[in-house]
């Protein structure tokens, strides 16, 4: 219960964050709906503040716009999962869910990207077969780290030529 109630605050932050970019969001209505959702979860309970934020804190580590879109995609999915376990007949829950689905459709598939990261973390790097494959791929990985994408290279070359 504590996780869910504190997550409602983060839901507010996400809705407001995307409200600046998605003009179709009615933030006043969403704030009212989120307040009703907070009441449903009794989020004014004292245990909500115990341990500090659980999701907002994670956003601090993701600084670039595309990175944030990946993590926000995961967070939106979490809220949709949380709302699946609530009374969907309530209009405020239905409205929040609809808005979250709309936001989710405008975000990259963060689940796939997170799965890729988890798969990499699980690779048994002491396995000889994995080591062989990794050694075979090392140079191309290093090239991707060193070589800037062509559009950045072209932009930096044109900036160097300009003597303005």
From Swiss-Prot:
Glycosylation sites per record: 42, 61
SUPFAM superfamilies with a match to the protein in the record: 4-helical cytokines
Any one cellular-component term (Gene Ontology): extracellular space
Domain of life the protein comes from: Eukaryota
Tagged with keyword Transmembrane helix: no
Entry keyword set: Antiviral defense, Cytokine, Glycoprotein, Growth regulation, Secreted, Signal
Subcellular location: Secreted
Transmembrane annotation, as ranges: none
Molecular-function annotations in GO: cytokine activity; type II interferon receptor binding
InterPro entries according to UniProt: 4_helix_cytokine-like_core (IPR009079), Interferon_gamma (IPR002069)
Function: Produced by lymphocytes activated by specific antigens or mitogens. IFN-gamma, in addition to having antiviral activity, has important immunoregulatory functions. It is a potent activator of macrophages, it has antiproliferative effects on transformed cells and it can potentiate the antiviral and antitumor effects of the type I interferons.
Subunit architecture: Homodimer.
Family assignment from sequence similarity: Belongs to the type II (or gamma) interferon family.
Protein name per UniProt: Interferon gamma
Lineage of the species this protein comes from: Eukaryota, Metazoa, Chordata, Craniata, Vertebrata
């Amino acid at each position: 219960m504590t996780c869910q109630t504190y997550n409602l605050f983060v839901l507010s932050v996400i809705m407001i964050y995307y409200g600046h970019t998605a003009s179709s969001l009615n933030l006043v209505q969403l704030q009212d709906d989120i307040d009703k959702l907070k009441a449903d979860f009794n989020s004014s309970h004292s245990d909500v503040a115990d341990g500090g934020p659980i999701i907002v804190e994670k956003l601090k580590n993701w600084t670039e716009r595309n990175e944030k879109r990946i993590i926000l995609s995961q967070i939106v999915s979490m809220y949709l999962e949380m709302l699946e376990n609530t009374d969907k007949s309530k209009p405020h829950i239905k409205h929040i869910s609809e808005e979250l689905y709309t936001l989710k459709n405008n975000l990259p598939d963060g689940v796939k990207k997170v799965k890729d990261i988890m798969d990499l973390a699980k690779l048994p790097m002491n396995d000889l077969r994995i080591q062989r494959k990794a050694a075979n791929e090392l140079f191309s990985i290093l090239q991707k780290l060193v070589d800037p994408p062509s559009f950045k290279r072209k932009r930096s070359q044109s900036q160097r030529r300009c003597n303005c």
